[in-house]
Amino acid sequence: MFSSFLFLISCSPDEEGKKTQADREKKAADRIYGLLPEEQGKMLYDLWLEFEAQKTPEAKFARVMDNLQPMMLNAATDGKAWVEHGVHLAQIMKRNEHTAEYSETLMEYAREMFIQPNLDNGHIIEDEKK
């Protein structure tokens, strides 16, 4: 179960689901933040909107962390979810397309510590060179 969750948050190929993702996330945010006291709910909702907009340095950093965490967790489980789901390097790189833009240092660290070792041991499928 946990490894399936790691797969879903790290590089799910569900293209159909992505089409409705923003709407589903908005509905979930409205529901969840609506459960909180009004002032607290508004503050957290505004932070979520800031995160989604990716305009501030803080939002960009939060996005980098959001993208790196699944790689760290997959690496910590010896690539279990990547192996179970036959994850390709291209899926991971697509999920992290803005990570390098926002922090080349952290993306390079992720390549060295999480991606390359799992490519080397076959836990991530290397895409064919075209």
Which residues make up each language-model segment?
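Alpha-helical, largely C-terminal catalytic domains
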Residues: 1-130
